[in-house]
């Protein structure tokens, strides 16, 4: 390792590899952490093999997500045997959820940090280098990492977290336990970030929040509808997306702004979880099946051609076959463009874990999930097939995995498109004629 001078103190430079699991917020957090560490003289590497320090930025939303982390830590044990000086840190939602128990769940962890404590990472890493294990799980009522310029991982699309945490208490969800209560960034700081990204040539900006519609800057009397409108005006010509919305919070005024601003993408992710009002009540979702239908009708009447995606859970506590059929019938009626689909797994500490019996056998959960996946695959296939022959505008994001002669990108409605390169590069906006489709992808050629 090389030596540098930092703050008049001689330090050894360390190469850091961060592996990010889970959601877009975790990806945005990794960019913030990278900036914090680079400011302290650490050097980032894209290879675990070249790293002196490996940080796992983790997700706890489902049981299998935690199992992935534990499997990775087991893999790291072998690395440490051959490289005794290697440090390993686990940060994010898993250590925040399990706290000090995490040290006993896997060997060889040098430090643990929750999502509100990333400013403490340089000190924790320095202690770990001296053989001192550390953990910090403090929640903050105001930490939004405002003022830190993230080390962006790309040059085309960028994330801006505008709020953190969640005040909803859905019965199945760990987010309030791992991300804390809602707090929002000042709207002026968001607009400053947007301005910098637009001036730097970014083509797409996604506003992030665990419950983004709850954004509120009380001092500026600015809610999410106002923020989204101001962002769209400040970054005219840049695609604007946002996620994730709660059905009970999405408003007619917000939908009108999306319809009015050409650069706000016509794609809304609106998790419903179940099509049964009884299950929605058990889940503490705050709305009924009928109210969700009303939201969908309002959105589609205001925004022609909008795509709507969702999240669905199979086999939640007490779910009957009738409840499951209600989910399938909702899917048939709404015809989601795509969906994230899972079967229920108990998360300790949640209301469901404490008060509701996990009484649907795992095999039955899997069977119901298979039905949901099959139906959504059919619906997605039909909706994509309807695009064949159309000319759509695609923001090229990267070279296609299929061939170096093809690019991959997305429409403003968030449909994935693979198309013949024809001299175009990532970052270009390309008019593409759709020739064929699959349930997941549109295939075309420049028009």
Swiss-Prot record:
GO CC entries: cytosol
Signal peptide: none
Domain Radical SAM core as annotated: residue spans: 152-382
Subcellular location: Cytoplasm
Cofactors, names only: [4Fe-4S] cluster
Principal EC category: transferase
Keyword check for Metal-binding: yes
Binding site for [4Fe-4S] cluster 2: 166, 170, 173
Substrates-to-products reaction catalysed: N(6)-dimethylallyladenosine(37) in tRNA + (sulfur carrier)-SH + AH2 + 2 S-adenosyl-L-methionine = 2-methylsulfanyl-N(6)-dimethylallyladenosine(37) in tRNA + (sulfur carrier)-H + 5'-deoxyadenosine + L-methionine + A + S-adenosyl-L-homocysteine + 2 H(+)
Primary subcellular site in the record, as a coarse category: cytoplasm
Record GO terms (molecular function): 4 iron, 4 sulfur cluster binding; metal ion binding; N6-isopentenyladenosine methylthiotransferase activity
Domain TRAM: residue ranges: 385-447
Subunit architecture: Monomer.
Protein task: Catalyzes the methylthiolation of N6-(dimethylallyl)adenosine (i(6)A), leading to the formation of 2-methylthio-N6-(dimethylallyl)adenosine (ms(2)i(6)A) at position 37 in tRNAs that read codons beginning with uridine.
Family designation: Belongs to the methylthiotransferase family. MiaB subfamily.
Entry protein name: tRNA-2-methylthio-N(6)-dimethylallyladenosine synthase
Lineage start: Bacteria, Pseudomonadati, Chlorobiota, Chlorobiia, Chlorobiales
